[in-house]
């Protein structure tokens, strides 16, 4: 892996933050120079909570890029989608600021993992969806899914959106976080999605994230 990758999820609370941290940790262990970025963090004041989680999982302290806010260029106080959080905070989301920060990180690190807010269709502004931004920047996507009820539907909808927008899927990460809810559904979801990934995105990688991987 080399370059900038956008980490998205099929839904909220799918384990995207943990997955991003674990992937970064694995890349560090492989000798890669890697950093994570949360371009838009909502529900916070000063420090992006997700970046703090990434650093803890990676086993490293906050970096100079964190202190300079390159990894968390836009923070809004209200816990909502970016377009609403920005409106409630009374200021516009600065896309140029985000782009510049990501470019600076990409110049310093071999791999930049950009964790989005929610799923592909989350609005960044009133007129721009997350998937629009991904396409504009040309980022390949790492999509996080799980075995909870509804994941097959949400994953296939995400597949369809990526195809429609002409965005490359780098990998599908199956997070075992929800396996305990229903083992039958979890196992069937895993088997089904693994087959669909091979059929729909033959060049994409299949990854699995165990509950213990973040420890």
UniProtKB/Swiss-Prot annotation:
Protein name (database record): ATP-dependent dethiobiotin synthetase BioD
Gene name of the record: bioD
SUPFAM superfamilies named among the record's database cross-references: P-loop containing nucleoside triphosphate hydrolases
Positions that bind Mg(2+): 17, 50, 115
Obligatory cofactor(s): Mg(2+)
List of catalytic residues: 38
Positions contributing to ATP binding: 13-18, 50, 115-118, 175-176
Family label: Belongs to the dethiobiotin synthetase family.
GO molecular function: ATP binding; dethiobiotin synthase activity; magnesium ion binding
Pathway recorded for this protein: Cofactor biosynthesis; biotin biosynthesis; biotin from 7,8-diaminononanoate: step 1/2
Known partners and oligomeric status: Homodimer.
Enzyme Commission number(s) of this protein: 6.3.3.3
């Amino acid at each position: 892996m080399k370059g900038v990758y956008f980490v998205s999820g099929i839904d909220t609370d799918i384990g995207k933050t943990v997955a991003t941290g674990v992937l970064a940790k694995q890349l560090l262990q492989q000798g890669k120079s890697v950093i994570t970025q949360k371009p838009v963090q909502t529900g916070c004041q000063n420090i992006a909570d997700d970046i703090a989680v990434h650093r803890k999982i990676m086993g490293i302290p906050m970096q100079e890029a964190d202190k300079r806010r390159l990894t968390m260029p836009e923070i809004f106080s209200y816990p909502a989608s970016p377009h609403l959080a920005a409106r409630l905070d009374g200021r516009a989301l600065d896309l140029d600021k985000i782009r510049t920060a990501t470019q600076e990180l990409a110049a310093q690190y071999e791999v930049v993992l950009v964790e989005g807010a929610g799923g592909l269709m989350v609005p960044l502004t009133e007129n721009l969806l997350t998937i629009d931004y991904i396409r504009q920047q040309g980022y390949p996507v790492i999509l996080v899914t799980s075995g909870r009820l509804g994941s097959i539907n949400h994953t296939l909808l995400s597949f369809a959106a990526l195809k429609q927008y002409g965005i490359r899927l780098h990998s599908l990460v199956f997070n075992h976080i929800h396996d305990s809810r229903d083992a039958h559904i979890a196992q069937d979801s895993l088997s089904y999605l693994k087959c669909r990934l091979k059929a729909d995105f033959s060049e994409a990688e299949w990854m699995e994230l165990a509950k213990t991987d973040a420890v």
